[in-house]
Regions:
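Small/polar beta-strand repeat architecture
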Residues: 365-382, 390-400, 404-460
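Phosphate-coordinating catalytic segments in nucleotide- and nucleic-acid-processing enzymes
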Residues: 174-175, 383, 387
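A broadly conserved detector of short glycine/acidic/proline-rich loop/turn motifs that flank catalytic sites
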Residues: 157, 162-165, 169, 340, ...
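A structural detector for beta-sheet-dominated domains
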Residues: 6, 42, 185, 197-201, ...
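Extracellular/virion structural assembly segments
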Residues: 2, 181, 185-186, 208-216, ...
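A generic structural signal for beta-strand entry/edge sites
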Residues: 333, 382-385, 425-429, 474-476
Length: 492
């Protein structure tokens, strides 16, 4: 009895889950009666599957194709509202977006001459190397040149530029209430030696020290303006900031590529979609044109006898219903569009291919006016500074709001987080007085309520993708999607 691994897995290699994960074994008993190779698959140290195959008739080899099996144990780790900078990017237990895998090989056969005996099993005759599988998929033309070390963050003593798990352009537009996430792989323990560095035009702006995290080999950074401002407790990404860059460092040495975010003013009509990209990370894209919303409603009806029997006489009252409606089903649908760059248009097809797409219900950004109640702006210390807010329906006394005022050179007093004292009509009072903030004049500002976001699942209803060719002009993308749940209706 001898099993030989002809084609072993590369020890310590990270394999994308949707691409081939194959191994080949052979045995000197492959000519025996009813011979089959056995592969016991271990995920995170636990046997989860046993595969048995007959030997190849030409070579006698056993070819095990494991990708489809392993995909059953792969799952995206959903977003949380923790707003920590360093987060787990995979669960510790399967199903997970990062798995530790190895195989034990054996064989079974009937050792009698006439092939009429009992088939005996001989498991655990050889063990493969341990390798890792992460949620990801590389295109047919790209996978032959795939090298996992390009994505594996290390602890190098010299500057490195390892890639995050995304195919998106490395320069993206965001606004103040946008979240953004970057996943990465590493074998190293995440602890205080790791830092997320934020720079402005290459100059250090701020940094975030990592806590000690469970070793799951895949991690997620929260690097959007909403994430950073929530974590710091103040809107440090504000109208003074036109762009910022982030990268990952170990012992103050850069280990990752540099990702750049251009901070744009909010637009009137925005629809921000998130989706799981081909490399398993959470991707984002914002459509800026008006969202066209509608409902597709399916209803069933039947005719019932009109009237009622009272004292053996049929009668009805005007208003009685003869046609009765039942089984109402309403599906909310949307159509969105926007212009985008050539690079973005090449990448956007990943949204159409994603099995998991969602839209955000984010803290709403509003443009407001900040004014002196006395109307003088000349130094009445006790004069209240009030906010005029167009829509106060979601604001209550005790709520916290984040204020990002217009850019005035040398004046940054109202950039901050405030607690609402009272809401009267459109007037919001946060307890500010002229003597505390000295506004030079009436100010414009953006505010949003300091609260968590919600994720609403959607399904893309387009079955054909129009591929945009590269041109010298921006290209327009349109998308139809519907909510991945029906509206609740009253039973008829």
């Amino acid at each position: 009895m001898a099993i030989t691994i002809v084609s072993n897995f590369t020890s310590g290699r990270f394999y994308p889950s949707a691409n081939p994960i194959n191994t080949t074994v052979t045995s000197n008993n492959s000519g025996k009666c009813n011979f089959r190779y056995i592969c016991d698959l271990y995920v995170n140290g636990t046997k989860v599957f046993t595969d048995k195959i007959f030997p190849d008739p030409n070579t006698g080899y056993g070819f095990f194709l494991l990708s489809r099996v392993l995909q059953d144990y792969i799952a995206t780790l959903g977003l949380s509202n923790s707003f920590a900078m360093f987060n787990l990017g995979a669960s510790a237990a399967a199903p997970s977006a990062s798995l530790s895998v190895y195989c034990r090989f054996g064989e079974e056969y009937d050792n009698t001459i006439n092939c009429d005996g009992t088939v005996l099993q001989y498991p655990n005759l050889a063990t493969s190397t341990t390798f890792f599988v992460y949620e990801g998929a590389f295109d047919y033309e790209d996978f032959p040149t795939y090298n996992h070390t390009n994505y594996l963050m290390g602890t190098a003593s010299a500057t490195a530029s390892k890639s995050f798990l995304t195919n998106s352009p490395r320069e993206v537009d965001v606004t103040y209430n946008d979240t953004y996430y970057l996943d990465f792989l590493t074998m190293a323990t995440i602890n205080s030696n790791w830092r997320l560095i934020v720079t402005i035009n290459g100059v250090l702006f701020t940094q975030f020290i990592a806590p000690t995290l469970t070793n799951v080999r895949r991690y997620r950074l929260a690097v959007g303006p909403l994430n950073i401002n929530k974590l710091t407790g103040a809107p440090i990404i504000n109208q003074e900031i036109t762009s910022y860059e982030v990268y990952l460092a170990h012992n103050n040495i850069r280990q990752s590529e540099i990702f750049r975010f251009n901070v744009k003013d909010p637009k009137t009509f925005t629809t921000r979609l998130g989706f799981v990209g081909l490399l398993g990370g959470i991707e984002h894209f914002t459509f800026y044109h008006r969202n066209q919303k509608g409902f597709t409603i399916d209803r069933r009806t039947y005719e019932k006898t009109l009237g009622r029997n009272i004292s053996n006489a049929w009668s009805y009252t005007v208003g009685d219903r003869g046609t009765t409606t039942y089984k109402l089903n309403a599906q909310e649908q949307h159509r969105v569009s926007t212009y985008c760059s050539q690079d973005m248009s090449e990448w956007l097809y990943e949204m159409w291919l994603s099995p998991d797409v969602f839209t955000y219900r984010r803290p709403e950004l509003q443009e407001i006016r900040i004014y002196d109640e006395a109307g003088t702006y000349t130094g009445t210390p006790d004069s209240r500074i009030l906010f005029w807010v167009n829509d106060t329906s979601n604001l209550r006394a005790g709520d916290f709001i984040v204020v990002i005022p217009e850019k005035i050179e040398g004046y940054v007093e109202f950039i901050g987080r405030f607690q609402i004292v009272s809401v009267v009509g459109n007037i919001v009072d946060v307890g500010a007085t002229y003597g505390s903030y000295y506004p030079p004049r009436q100010l414009c500002a953006y505010i949003y309520k300091d609260t968590n976001f919600d994720i609403l699942p959607v399904t893309i209803s387009d079955n054909a993708i129009e591929v945009k060719q590269k041109t010298s002009r921006p290209v327009e993308y349109s998308l139809n999607y519907q909510m991945a749940y029906s509206k609740n209706t009253i039973r008829g």
